[in-house]
Amino acid sequence: MKNLFLFCRAGYEKECAAEIQQRAAELNVGGFVKTNNNDAYVVYQCFEDDGADTLVKQLPLDSLIFARQMFAASELLADLPESDRVSPIVAALSEVSKAGELRVETPDTNEAKELSAFCRKFTVPLRQHLKKSGSLLAQENPKRPIIHVCFIGPGRAYAGYSLSNNSSPNFMGIPRLKMAADAPSRSSLKLDEAFAQFVPKEEQEERVRSGMNAVDLGACPGGWTYQLVRRGMFVSAVDNGPMNEKLMETGQVKHFREDGFRFEPQRKNIYWLVCDMVEKPARVAELIEAWAINGWFKEAIFNLKLPMKSRYKEVMAILNTMQDILKENGITEFKLQCKHLYHDRDEVTVHLWLKPSQPWN
């Protein structure tokens, strides 16, 4: 297949497009981008007929900042007849054999989501016909490719596949997280999603566990502290503002009424550092770099607020500078990841893991 379909947040098509253009070029997969503002998706059309097949194999989804999900796709199936939408889609998927799951999706826009009821109903007959054609297995199999059919409008869809080991497990790439009734703020969901995004489920028991010490810079009123407390951690919450009373009553939180940029931990036994401050992204990055150079944490999750223009360029400049500074200061082993999470708005979330091969303390 020659098209790569990428889901993203509405309004971030330009950033997603710039990123896939650069990353595909690094893999020598030439092509061009087709996108419109606020469509919540980008199509990268490769020059080679198998270009998208190469990208879904060689380009890790987790390494992309602005794409929530991606799949190798057919040409746009336009004007699907109401009398038989199934046959053209089955024909477009003839290259796909023995897939393990079917997802009939839409982009994440209000207009496209009006098709969601139709998509649910349409999944049943489409699934039956794909099983008959051999494109879909009779039983779901999480280790086989996933078939995606994305309706971008009535009677208009892209059809294709993703690989199960390089794909979001979530429908449309969107995690379904519930806002806890006692969480101090909606920002709490950002850290909840970040843990799921950056720490594999099988490693969470070791890396996100009860009894750990954590620091939350810019903690007020406690949305991110809440997620740390919920996981049994002891938290130094740093903010001049007031903290949520229920959080303080847990006995797991010590509130330091001071500026997060000036705070220095009294004890150097911090595993997690988290930070969601409304501040210039370069200044936040410099703060995290200083903590890393001092060895004051093992893993950090922090948000970078995005400028109105040149957002992809700005993020990449900050991440590249951070890598250079860490290396210049003797920190050669680290893992740096960045994602525009579903619960992020005009910001991205970054994860920095220092010396992943070495155990903590």
Curated annotation (Swiss-Prot):
Keywords: Cytoplasm, Methyltransferase, rRNA processing, S-adenosyl-L-methionine, Transferase
EC number per UniProt: 2.1.1.186
Binding site for S-adenosyl-L-methionine: S187, C220, P221, G222, G223, D239, D259, D276
Molecular function per GO: rRNA (cytosine-2'-O-)-methyltransferase activity
Record localization: Cytoplasm
Active site: K305
SUPFAM superfamilies xref list: S-adenosyl-L-methionine-dependent methyltransferases
Any Pfam family hit: RLMM_N
Keyword Plastid: no
Record flagged with keyword DNA repair: no
GO BP terms in the entry: rRNA processing
Gene Ontology CC terms: cytoplasm
First-listed, main subcellular location of the protein, grouped into a coarse class: cytoplasm
Catalytic activity: cytidine(2498) in 23S rRNA + S-adenosyl-L-methionine = 2'-O-methylcytidine(2498) in 23S rRNA + S-adenosyl-L-homocysteine + H(+)
Function (record text): Catalyzes the 2'-O-methylation at nucleotide C2498 in 23S rRNA.
Family of the protein in this entry: Belongs to the class I-like SAM-binding methyltransferase superfamily. RNA methyltransferase RlmE family. RlmM subfamily.
Family annotation (HAMAP family): 23SrRNA_methyltr_M (MF_01551)
Complexes and interactors: Monomer.
NCBIfam families reported for this sequence: PRK11760.1
This protein's name: Ribosomal RNA large subunit methyltransferase M
Organism per entry: Shewanella oneidensis (strain ATCC 700550 / JCM 31522 / CIP 106686 / LMG 19005 / NCIMB 14063 / MR-1)
Gene: rlmM
